[in-house]
C-alpha cells in the first residue's frame, strides 16, 4: 500500500523545460490561477516552494499591470 501511494505522487512537472515564470507570459500564469482569479496552492500546482514564490510575485505584478484580473471578492 505504501508503494502505490508513493507512485501515485509521481507526476509530470507543471512547468516544462524551456518555460520561464514571467509576468509577461500570461498563458503560463493563467494555468496557475483559478476561475475566480485566486492563485492555486502549491500542492495543486505541483511546484517547488521557490517556483511558487516566483509565480506568486509574477501573478501579482501582472495584476498590477492589468494583464490578469484581481480576485472577485463577491460570492
Swiss-Prot record:
Keywords: Plastid, Ribonucleoprotein, Ribosomal protein, RNA-binding, rRNA-binding. GO terms for cellular component: mitochondrial small ribosomal subunit; plastid. Gene3D superfamilies: Ribosomal protein S18. InterPro entries: Ribosomal_bS18, Ribosomal_bS18_sf. One of its GO terms (molecular function) is small ribosomal subunit rRNA binding. One of its GO terms (biological process) is translation. The keyword rRNA-binding applies. Belongs to the bacterial ribosomal protein bS18 family. This is Small ribosomal subunit protein bS18c. It comes from Aneura mirabilis (Parasitic liverwort).
Amino acid at each position: 500500500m505504501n508503494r502505490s501511494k508513493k507512485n501515485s505522487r509521481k507526476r509530470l512537472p507543471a512547468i516544462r523545460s524551456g518555460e520561464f515564470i514571467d509576468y509577461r507570459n500570461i498563458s503560463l500564469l493563467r494555468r496557475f490561477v483559478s476561475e475566480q482569479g485566486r492563485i492555486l496552492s502549491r500542492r495543486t500546482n505541483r511546484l517547488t516552494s521557490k517556483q511558487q514564490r516566483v509565480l506568486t510575485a509574477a501573478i501579482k505584478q501582472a495584476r498590477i499591470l492589468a494583464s490578469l484580473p484581481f480576485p472577485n471578492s463577491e460570492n
